[in-house]
Amino acid sequence: MVQCLVVDDDPRILNYIASHLQIEHIDAYTQPSGEAALKLLEKQRVDIAVVDIMMDGMDGFQLCNTLKNDYDIPVIMLTARDALSDKERAFISGTDDYVTKPFEVKELIFRIRAVLRRYNINSNSEMTIGNLTLNQSYLELQVSNKTMTLPNKEFQLLFMLAARPKQIFTREQIIEKIWGYDYEGDERTVDVHIKRLRQRLKKLNATLTIETVRGQGYKVENHV
């Protein structure tokens, strides 16, 4: 089941969203502040976050930036602030979508599901290809009785490739999906992560391999 973090200092909004998420079979974890949300994430993994902007202490912009950079969690901003400058700041902070109050809760749920699809997150956060099972909730790879936990970026990269076998992804596409469009580091970081993933897959004796397509990028092949 999808785990959704909802952060807002208005308890009525928290209860309203949570009740509708539960109807849609989405687990809701509600928190009244950015600080409380980060405390929760020390012990609870979530798949997506819905975040208000105007909160005491850590505001939504700061929280969004932390969720994206430290946890790589998709974020939807939900706020009464509808100025273009606020939207610009939100997207610079890393938000994946922006919804203004008052809002239709069904539209919010549509947007949650759309963002989850972009991140290849499904209801059980698990995918099997060949002899390899990827568990997104625990960032784990499993082949037979062997299990390996990966760093977040490595796992998300492999999950993205494995979700579309044989599809070629360029470095630019990978960076935008995994690190974000505003990433300013060396694009060769993709090559480093691919090299590590290949070593891990070989160690597990996985039937899955990551192939280099010269001049284009990378793709996954399953050898069964």
Curated annotation (Swiss-Prot):
Its subcellular locations are: Cytoplasm
Question: Where, per the database record, does this protein carry 4-aspartylphosphate?
Answer: 52
- The segment(s) forming the Response regulatory domain are 3-116
Q: Which UniProt keywords apply?
A: Activator, Cytoplasm, DNA-binding, Phosphoprotein, Transcription, Transcription regulation, Two-component regulatory system, Virulence
Q: Posttranslational modification, per the record?
A: Phosphorylated by HssS.
Detail the disulphide connectivity of this chain as listed in its UniProt entry. Answer: none
Primary site of residence: cytoplasm
Provide the protein name: Heme response regulator HssR
Role according to the record: Member of the two-component regulatory system HssS/HssR involved in intracellular heme homeostasis and tempering of staphylococcal virulence. Phosphorylated HssR binds to a direct repeat sequence within hrtAB promoter and activates the expression of hrtAB, an efflux pump, in response to extracellular heme, hemin, hemoglobin or blood.
Q: Which GO terms describe its molecular function?
A: phosphorelay response regulator activity; transcription cis-regulatory region binding
A GO cellular component annotated for this chain's UniProt record is:
protein-DNA complex
Name the source's superkingdom. Answer: Bacteria
Question: Which GO annotations describe the biological process of this protein?
Answer: regulation of DNA-templated transcription
As recorded in UniProt, coiled-coil segments are none
Summarize which parts of the chain are annotated to bind DNA, as ranges.
124-222
Q: Tell me the organism.
A: Staphylococcus aureus (strain Newman)
